[in-house]
Design a protein with these regions (language model features):
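N-terminal nucleotide/polyanion-binding subdomain common to many enzyme families
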Residues: 1-101, 111-124, 129
Length: 131
């Protein structure tokens, strides 16, 4: 089963320049709670990510998860850890759309655009912050 997890601002923004758009003191506590939620949802499961998300993690997999990295035409980093599986998007969808195993899409936006229609569960957080 494919699922997706993301947090967003009320304007729909989920990222900015390969980073999260909520930074600074006013977002500190809610961002901490949302990262805790992210960890609780994804830990012990498989996750799937695109190139920019993997790059934002400095090409290091998330701990305590099997990491699927979607192959595109971009150059791939060499010597990836054993818990990173390289797979193309069509093979990924075929393998997991009807699987009992939950694989959580963690971004980025292009991968969400492709996988949301296959996601049986969507974990969405919206950050409402008073200015």
């Amino acid at each position: 089963m494919i699922s997706s997890i993301f947090a967003m601002l009320p304007n729909g923004s989920i990222g900015h320049k390969n980073s999260l758009p909520w930074k600074g003191q006013k977002y500190k506590e809610i961002a901490r709670r949302d990262m805790e939620h992210f960890k609780n949802v994804t830990e012990g499961k498989s996750v799937v990510m695109g190139y920019n998300t993997f790059e934002s993690l400095n090409f290091k997999p998330l701990k305590n998860r099997l990491n699927h990295f979607i192959i595109t035409s971009r150059d791939l980093p060499l010597n990836l850890p054993d818990n990173v599986i390289k797979i193309n998007i069509c093979d990924f969808i075929d393998k997991f759309k009807d699987s009992e195993e939950e694989v959580v899409c963690i971004g980025g936006s292009m991968l969400y655009d492709t996988l949301l229609k296959y996601s049986k569960v969507v974990y969405r957080s919206i950050f409402y912050i008073e200015e």
